[in-house]
A protein has these predicted regions:
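Short, low-complexity, Pro/Ser/Thr/Gly-rich segments in the mature regions of secreted, periplasmic
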Residues: 368-380
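Solenoid-like repeat scaffolds
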Residues: 38-44
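A short, glycine-centered helix-capping/turn motif at helix boundaries
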Residues: 13
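Short coil/linker segments at helix-helix boundaries
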Residues: 16-36, 56-359
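Bacterial N-terminal signal peptides
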Residues: 1-10
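Short helix-capping/linker turns of helical repeat alpha-solenoids
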Residues: 45-50
């Protein structure tokens, strides 16, 4: 058939190549899938497409940050003291860039509703990226996204290694995960917390000459409070979703009856109870129903804060974020601002002191760090 004849056929008669399905379980598939991702998320139509887009964007964010850090450190080493303001401006610019990107991926994750179904199969150990931008793929870059082997006990953390044997001994290089809704909630809560933290930081400017923090954008504190509060709620939904699962197929976070999981720390029934208690206590503290004990004599985690509030009062975290001090309020890096005392509230039956700081101190006292690490794993 001639070319002119083909062009004369109805459009439905011309065979079109179907777009390839996302493949995040092989090295070549990961590269091909991520290279094909659109810049504009508005064209995404399915949950699989949204998840592939979010994963590829997040991995690329890690690449951009790693490259920026490598080149930035090289520049900083040659800067003079009078150039410190330029360094601060560059860091602030990068935080704003990352925050905007986190928001874009968060909005796509919020749209994913898998129900009881499954989505993509992913194999993070196959994601190989030139992270530092030097044009080479080092051993640590080939295995950067690999998952530590699943086991009880203290996980091993350290700087990236160029010893291939290290990864073979301590990492599950072939781990696969069949994504379900609990995995989406896990990723979403991380995005909400990290974006909220960056917004929190950008509420402040740094006065290098006077070594002070300046509350420059109080409205950002209100944004941060809302986003972090949503992260706490998402973590609660994540816990409930994991416990409700009845299958056992290439899981990420798993409940005690699921054994086919690659999550580095096996979670037991008591861990899920602690997860709920922690979320409850953090939630009421975050929303101002419990008060933070910051009176004279407070030790441990709050020792550097005391005394913010007089005896019989506690710090209202919600008020601090939702009714912040005025723009221009300054805080020395060595001394808390007097304006914080206006965030204190009388302790009463409706607003008791939070038991959370004491609980954290008891749980981590004399420990090797496992308790704190588990909290990070569970509650993001």
């Amino acid at each position: 058939m001639s070319l002119s004849a083909v062009l004369a056929l109805p459009a439905t008669a011309v065979p079109l190549a179907a777009p390839s399905a996302p493949d995040l379980a092989t090295t070549d598939g990961f590269r091909r899938t991520c290279a094909a991702q659109p810049v504009n998320a508005d064209v995404l139509r399915t949950d699989d497409e949204r998840l592939a887009w979010a994963i590829c964007r997040d991995v690329d964010q890690v690449r951009q940050l790693s490259t920026w850090a490598r080149r930035g450190l090289a520049r900083i080493n040659h800067l003079q003291p009078e150039d410190q303001a330029a360094v601060v401006a560059e860091v602030e610019r990068k935080m704003d860039e990352v925050r905007a990107e986190m928001r874009r991926t968060r909005l796509q994750l919020e749209r994913v509703q898998l129900g009881a179904g499954r989505s993509l199969r992913i194999a993070p150990g196959q994601w190989q990226v030139d992270l530092d931008g030097d044009g080479e793929l080092s051993v640590w870059e080939r295995h950067f996204f690999a998952l530590p082997k699943r086991r009880h006990g203290e996980p091993q953390f350290g700087m990236p290694s160029d010893d291939a044997g290290h990864y073979e001994r301590h990492y599950d290089l072939n781990a696969v995960i069949d994504l379900d809704q609990s995995d989406v909630l896990w990723a979403l809560s991380y995005h909400q917390f990290i974006e909220g933290l960056l917004i929190n930081i950008r509420a402040f400017d740094v006065d290098l000459q006077r070594r002070e923090l300046v509350l420059a954008r109080p409205a950002l504190l209100r944004q941060a409070h809302g986003l972090i509060g949503r992260g706490l709620a998402t973590s609660g939904r994540l816990r409930d979703a994991v416990l409700a699962e009845t299958d056992d197929q290439n899981e990420w976070i798993s409940h005690p009856r699921q054994v086919n999981s690659v999550f580095p720390i096996p979670l037991e029934a008591a861990d899920f109870t602690t997860w709920r208690v922690m979320l409850d206590q953090v939630g009421v503290l975050w929303h101002g129903r419990h008060l933070l004990p910051t009176t004279a004599g407070a030790g441990g985690l709050l020792g550097s804060l005391a005394p913010v509030c007089p005896a019989g009062q506690g710090l209202d975290i919600a008020k601090l974020y939702l009714q912040p001090p005025p723009a221009g309020t300054r805080a020395s890096l060595n001394r808390l601002p007097a304006a914080l005392t206006t965030m204190c509230r009388k302790v009463d039956a409706a607003h008791p002191l939070s038991p959370l700081p004491g609980r954290l101190e008891r749980d981590t006292a004399g420990a090797t760090g496992m308790s704190a690490l588990r909290y990070l794993y569970w509650v993001n």
